[in-house]
């Protein structure tokens, strides 16, 4: 009798994201008799012929796969429906596509529903927002099961004290000056466009006085960033400001900063959504065009920072959530009442 297999599929260039990695680690420990397969090939390139071949390969793999776990639109529509024993699970990590769909339907609600995820048998939306989005704007087969009221694996993990302690030790190893301080994380994602003349990309924060901002932020805060534009600005700071500022690249991952942050400033829907379970302050900082920014500006305007200078409007002596931040946290994460990894383990233990 052949072994049961579980396939992790990611075809949008994201590889095994943190949610998939956490689920994989748990399943490998809990189900040692199961074989695991991976299809992580990006299917969108600049060469149409390659795209066609990659799509054919993805369709063949997913058709033959016994069980699939994905976290984005990686399961093709043009494959047969799953059999009664097969599981196709979508972990709905809050990537930008969710906000793109929401804004399109908000502006034009009469559009036909999308079939993007129609071959999934199980969906873990991770938040009330995503659950409503998927029910409102997507088509599903009759037998689909929504695993509601359960946070995503990374959100659950962010609250686990053992992991928080491990990451804290790592932070204090690299930045001993952060010990005992509150952590302000400025985590920005996106690729700056390359200038046509071949010169270096411009610093998008060039016009801002970082010293003024650092002086404004109370001394009981330590500012952490992954952003090189901010690091370049930090060269203008006197040495004593190193007690308040650190650059985490090649030291600590962006995801790990979710475990430690007391306030998050980001342009990433994924990080904002994952962090919302902590019920701590979140702000969106405009840095490269993001549909998530349009969403925040329209529906949570007090959380929107149009530029770096607007940090000077924040009250760093108060970490109580504003009414809009409370609403955001309620909308973008379920309460941590059930371990998502254990739920997924039960789903595949048949």
Describe these PLM feature segments.
Residues 51-65, 224-273:
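Donor nucleotide-activated moiety binding/catalytic core segment of transferases
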Residues 238-241, 270-336:
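Catalytic binding pocket for nucleotide-activated donors in carbohydrate/polymer assembly enzymes
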């Amino acid at each position: 009798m052949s072994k049961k297999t579980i396939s992790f599929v990611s075809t949008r260039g994201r590889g095994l994201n943190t949610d998939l990695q956490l689920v994989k680690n748990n399943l490998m420990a809990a189900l040692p008799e199961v074989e695991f397969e991976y299809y992580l090939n990006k299917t969108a390139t600049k060469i149409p012929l390659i795209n066609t071949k990659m799509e054919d390969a993805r369709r063949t793999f997913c058709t033959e796969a016994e069980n699939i776990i994905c976290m984005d639109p990686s399961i093709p529509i043009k494959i047969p429906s799953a059999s009664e024993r097969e599981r196709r699970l979508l972990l709905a990590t809050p990537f930008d596509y969710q906000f793109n769909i929401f804004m399109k339907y908000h502006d034009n609600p009469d559009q036909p529903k999308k079939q993007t995820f129609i071959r999934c048998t199980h969906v873990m939306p991770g938040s009330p927002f995503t659950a409503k989005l998927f029910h409102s704007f997507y088509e599903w087969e009759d037998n689909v099961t929504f695993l509601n009221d359960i946070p995503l694996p990374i959100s659950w993990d962010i609250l686990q004290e053992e992991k928080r302690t491990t990451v804290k030790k790592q932070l204090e190893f690299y930045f001993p000056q952060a010990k005992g301080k509150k952590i302000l994380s400025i985590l920005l994602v996106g690729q700056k466009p390359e200038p046509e003349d071949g010169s270096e990309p411009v610093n998008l924060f060039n016009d801002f006085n970082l010293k003024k901002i650092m002086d404004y932020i109370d001394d009981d805060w330590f500012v952490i960033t992954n952003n090189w534009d901010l690091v370049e600005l930090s060269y203008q700071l006197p040495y004593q400001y190193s007690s308040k500022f650190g650059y985490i690249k090649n030291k600590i991952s962006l995801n790990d900063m979710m475990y430690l942050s007391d306030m998050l400033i980001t342009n990433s829907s994924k990080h904002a959504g994952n962090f919302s379970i902590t019920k701590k302050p979140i702000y969106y900082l405009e840095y490269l065009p993001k549909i998530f920014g349009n969403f925040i500006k329209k529906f949570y305007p007090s959380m929107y920072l149009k530029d770096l200078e607007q940090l000077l409007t924040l009250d760093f002596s108060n970490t109580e959530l504003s009414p809009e931040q409370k609403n955001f946290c309620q909308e973008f994460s379920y309460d941590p009442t059930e371990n998502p990894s254990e739920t997924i383990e039960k789903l595949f233990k048949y």
